[in-house]
Amino acid sequence: MKRLISILVALSAWGIAIGQPSVRIAHGPYLQQVTDDGFTVVWTTTINAASWVEVAPDDGSHFYAAERPKYYDSHIGKRRIGRLHRVRVEGLAPGTTYRYRIMQQGVLCDEGNKRVVLGESYGSDILKHMPYTATTLDEKKDQTEFWVVNDIHAQDSIFRLLLEGAEKAKPDFVCFNGDMLTSMESEKQLFEGY
């Protein structure tokens, strides 16, 4: 009888665990507000999550050769929970390239200040793919090349044409200046509009 009860409890726990939604990156990451000492990473997830960014210098070392600093999306000391994540990374050296990994932990239960239950953690896969990189601005640089794109109004063909040579030219940054869509009625339209 004890064996039967143990098996039933194990199966129930397994069923509950399997039934939990899995947190994954839905869109992004995108870099914003790049300065000489930092940058902001923005992305969305498939479910509500708590998030953070792990940063390492681009020095050829294994990403996990040492404990890497973690930067959190927080407000007055409390980690924000949601599907849209904005993590500011600061205190970096000017004109330096950094590798980063985005991480999120799914929220299974959110009762505000009473209780928050976090589920599995998931991050960008740096073992199978190269980590994302960001380079801080260098004020000592003689010149900066940037491209500005705007008034696309969901015309993907124009967008692709304007950015056709970017990979070869390697501008320091590309700025999306607005009017990427004529109107926005849904989140889906924002990400699939171009």
Spans of model-derived segments:
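Bacterial Sec-dependent N-terminal signal peptides
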Residues: 1-23
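Acidic, histidine-bearing metal-coordination/catalytic regions of metal-dependent phosphoesterases
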Residues: 18-148, 167-168
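Active-site neighborhood of divalent metal-dependent phosphoester/pyrophosphate hydrolases
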Residues: 141-194
